[in-house]
Amino acid sequence: MDKYAVWGNPIAQSRSPQLHRYFAKQTRQNLDYVAILGDEEKFEQQLSDFFAQGAKGCNITAPFKERAFKLAQQHSKRCLSAESCNTLKKLADGTLFADNTDGAGLVSDLQRLNWLKPNQRILILGAGGATKGVLLPLLQAQQNILITNRTFSRAEDLAHKFNHFGTIEALDLEHIPIQTFDLIINATSTGLQGKTIDIDPQILQLASAVYDMQYSKESDTPFIALCKKQGVTKISDGFGMLVGQAAHAFYLWRGVMPEIDPLFSGNEIKI
């Protein structure tokens, strides 16, 4: 049985194992997929041991996406643009191929929600690996991107790096203009610690829609809870993005694209 996993820290909240087992059953693939807690001090050695033991591939989540990118010998174009990876595949020659399916997952979910229209103003909170992975697909979808981050220089660096792909600008977190954004995307990992980014509540109140890349099976994420408190009604967590990126990762590994619509139809048991 082929072995796969998702690496992160924390990782207990991950629904990736259930998703990939669902995909495997649906497509009649013989594989096992587990969640593994990465050690922030020993991650590279852990990952090396994982593949040395015969594993075929894995997903990478916070805080290891940029570190995993550096471990791979080959990269997809979208992965190179992000300098961050969420999917690794062991090739026949033993080398690691890195891909980033986060952007494809986000765009497909925004399309499913009918939230993706040309020339929208999208404010992205955070400038880490999660943001890097989605910028190129959003810019290719003709979105106008504004990035803010607690460390402003990181937002500036990203805006400079991606400005030849489309309209993108960095904003100081403490000086975001009070105006309506078509969509606010939370790409920070603060929710994993039960926290939220410190943002002026008026900005949330004026938002046409809010999307949190994080997700929670049991309750609202801290960011979604904050948005609801501010009266925002058009809200989505990142479960649909998780499903989309997982489907693209599964296709990379197995060569078959699973059907994801049943997961949102109400006719299947939710993952």
Curated annotation (Swiss-Prot):
Keyword Amino-acid biosynthesis carried by entry: yes
Stored InterPro entries: Aminoacid_DH-like_N_sf (IPR046346), NAD(P)-bd_dom_sf (IPR036291), SDH_C (IPR041121), Shikimate_DH (IPR011342), Shikimate_DH-bd_N (IPR013708), Shikimate_DH_fam (IPR022893), Shikm_DH/Glu-tRNA_Rdtase (IPR006151)
A GO molecular-function annotation: NADP binding
Assigned EC number: 1.1.1.25
Binding site for shikimate: S14, R15, S16, T61, N86, D102, Y215
Domain of life: Bacteria
Alphabetic keyword roster: Amino-acid biosynthesis, Aromatic amino acid biosynthesis, NADP, Oxidoreductase
Binding site for NADP(+): G126, A127, G128, G129, A130, N149, R150, T151, F152, S153, R154, M213, G238
GO biological process: amino acid biosynthetic process; aromatic amino acid family biosynthetic process; chorismate biosynthetic process; shikimate metabolic process
Active site: K65 (proton acceptor)
CDD domains: NAD_bind_Shikimate_DH
Cellular component terms (Gene Ontology): cytosol
Pathway: Metabolic intermediate biosynthesis; chorismate biosynthesis; chorismate from D-erythrose 4-phosphate and phosphoenolpyruvate: step 4/7
Enzyme class: oxidoreductase
Catalytic activity: shikimate + NADP(+) = 3-dehydroshikimate + NADPH + H(+)
Role played: Involved in the biosynthesis of the chorismate, which leads to the biosynthesis of aromatic amino acids. Catalyzes the reversible NADPH linked reduction of 3-dehydroshikimate (DHSA) to yield shikimate (SA).
Quaternary structure note: Homodimer.
Family membership noted in the UniProt record: Belongs to the shikimate dehydrogenase family.
Name by which UniProt lists this protein: Shikimate dehydrogenase (NADP(+))
